[in-house]
Amino acid sequence: MTVNPDAPALPTLPLAVETIQGLLPHRYPFALVDRIIDYVPGERAVGIKNVTFNEPQFQGHFPGRPLMPGVLIVEAMAQVGGVIVTLMPDMPQGLFVFAGIDQVRFRRPVVPGDQLVLSAQLLSVKRRRFCKIQGEAMVDGQLAASGELLFSLVE
């Protein structure tokens, strides 16, 4: 296991999509964070996802009544959490993937034109391989989704 010596120092906010792509492996159509607007090292991050009608999932989910799939809302929360973990200088190199999703609840639909405000709070890190994050997705100040997300390092 190697330590990530290339983890960036404290970033200048906001983080634009180009910077986020330097931190996370996700690319279109699964790069779901447009901007990081708040970041506290090793603790929390807040990101923005602008939901647009031209995203591929809306072709079939659902014709005539487009709704952002819940799994993509959860993935967007996870990507914000991934920024926290990736910027931790003592974390090993590798790919963090889902190990579990607990207590996820969806409270309101997310539709094209909405702006998701995605919050991630780091709850725990175990053996530098497992992380637990509390995520929330808000639209217009209303809770759209929340839950605990667990990650595991794949080397």
From Swiss-Prot:
Enzyme class: lyase
InterPro entries: FabA_FabZ, FabZ, HotDog_dom_sf
CDD domains named in the record: FabZ (cd01288)
Sections of the chain in a coiled coil: none
Example of a GO biological process term: lipid A biosynthetic process
Catalytic center residues: 61
Subcellular locations according to the entry: Cytoplasm
Signal peptide (UniProt feature, chain positions): none
Catalytic reaction annotation: a (3R)-hydroxyacyl-[ACP] = a (2E)-enoyl-[ACP] + H2O
EC number: 4.2.1.59
Function: Involved in unsaturated fatty acids biosynthesis. Catalyzes the dehydration of short chain beta-hydroxyacyl-ACPs and long chain saturated and unsaturated beta-hydroxyacyl-ACPs.
Family: Belongs to the thioester dehydratase family. FabZ subfamily.
Name of the protein in question: 3-hydroxyacyl-[acyl-carrier-protein] dehydratase FabZ
Organism: Synechococcus elongatus (strain ATCC 33912 / PCC 7942 / FACHB-805)
Lineage: Bacteria, Bacillati, Cyanobacteriota, Cyanophyceae, Synechococcales
